[in-house]
Structure formats: C-alpha cells, structure tokens
Amino acid sequence: MQNGWRGLQKREVVQIAALKVDDDFNVVAEFNQLCQPKINLILSDYFVNLTGISNDDVAQKGVDFASAYQRFKAFVGNDVCYSHGWNGAFEDACDGAILAENLRLYGLPADNSVKYRNIAALFKQVYQKYNVAVSSQSSGQICKILGLQQQLADLHLDEHNALYDVYSILCGVRHFADDFAILKQK
C-alpha cells in the first residue's frame, strides 16, 4: 500500500485509544494502548512527526497488537464504538475496518464482536444545520474547526495522536450536545 510515510508498507496499528462517556458526555474511562509493529519495525520520521509517538515510546509502552486488541475489546464490552471517517456513512466501521485489516495482517481470527459506527456522518449533518463550512476533516481537527482546541491543551498532544483525536471528537459532541443526543440511545 502506498502511504506517504515510507513507500509501500502495511497499515499496522501503532495506537488504539477510546473513551467511555456517560449520558452527559463526561469521560468515565479512558483507553490508550501503544502497539509494537511486527512488520514495519521502525516508525518513520513522518509518522513520529505526525503523531508525536516515538520508537522509544513504542518499545517501552507498546504491546503486541493481539494483546492490545483484546484489551480494547474488553474496554468496549457491549458498547457501540464510534470512530471517524469523513467519507463514510453512519453504518461504516471506519477504524474498525483498520483493526480488522490488522487482524488479517497478523493471521488472527476475524472478529465482529465490536459494533462500530461512523460519527463523521453525524458531524456532517450538524455542520450543515449550523452552516459550519467544512469540506473534509480528520477527527483531530474537530475541536480546532470549532475554535475549541484550548479545551484539549492539558493533553499536551496534537492531532493524529489517537488519544487526542478521540478527545477532539468528544469536544465536538459536547459542543453540539443536543444534536448528538441520539448517541445516548445507541
């Protein structure tokens, strides 16, 4: 796969992050796990600069993908996992498809136990409702587009770090809380 990071490489997951929130969109639990790549053993400078995750971080705090995925599944439990893919529909798996790709990549059994939904489709509807002009966005850009990035300053992270990105999604959901009330029913 051609990817701008370092020629032809597999899309190995290096970080999985997720939040659990209550009905008022307050964080009740946080999941953040680094994964040690098995194929692309050295993270490219592009990736390190993009995410702020270093090779030392992965070596010291990372676990193999299979362990990280099992921990992630345990964290999610029976809840719906909302991820973000700008060009996808609400029913699309988005990040779930990347996790499934990594299961295949590592020869692990397919797993459909986690239910994924694409929250970007809801953001598009809300942006249209409030005339927020956005032609595309990544999950980490949500709080910046809304001028709310100061709310995430204490994370000391930036866009494309998965933990920052999930907090950025939550920042947007909180900003438009009434419009995202549908998430409480899922």
What is each residue range found by the language model?
Residues 1-100, 144-146:
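Conserved non-catalytic scaffold segment of RNase H-like nuclease domains
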Residues 1-3, 121, 168:
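Short, glycine/acidic-enriched loop or turn micro-motifs at the edges of active sites
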Residues 8-10, 82, 111-115, 134, ...:
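Short, surface-exposed helix-loop/turn micro-motifs enriched in polar/charged residues
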Residues 24-26, 105-112:
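Short helix-capping segments at alpha-helix termini
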Residues 35-42, 46-51, 55-58, 120-166:
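Active-site-proximal helix-loop-helix substrate-binding element of RNase H-like nuclease domains
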Residues 77-98, 102-103, 132-186:
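Acidic, Mg2+-coordinating catalytic module of metal-dependent nucleases/exonucleases
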Residues 109-124:
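Conserved beta-strand -> loop -> alpha-helix junction used to position metal-binding or nucleic-acid-contacting
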